[in-house]
Amino acid sequence: MKEGDIAIASLRQADGTIKDRPVLLLRRMPPFQDFLVCGISTQLQQSAPELDETITPNDPDFRTSGLKAPSLIRIGFLAVLPRSHFRGRIGAISSVRLDRLMSRLSEFLRPKKV
């Protein structure tokens, strides 16, 4: 698996339960080859427009994503997961979308000037 892939992984939810969910692999983390991931959800109404991005069947990379329904790529729902938490790869997003999401995350994490 590599950055930009969408995989199924065991991910802790806000209520503390662990569920197998689609995740986007954002960055491989040294030294143990864990991955920084963000969750993917079909709950479009939970969108945080300054962070999240919707992917729909009208998007050129939807088919290659492996997702089955319009979904939110939730940049604000981050986790670092070991390889053992992944059940397998289902697809990938375009490099253009990955770059845009990484820029959005980087900008969000940058200190705000007061």
Where are these regions (language model features)?
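Conserved functional hotspots at enzyme active or ligand-binding sites that engage polyanionic ligands
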Residues: 1-114
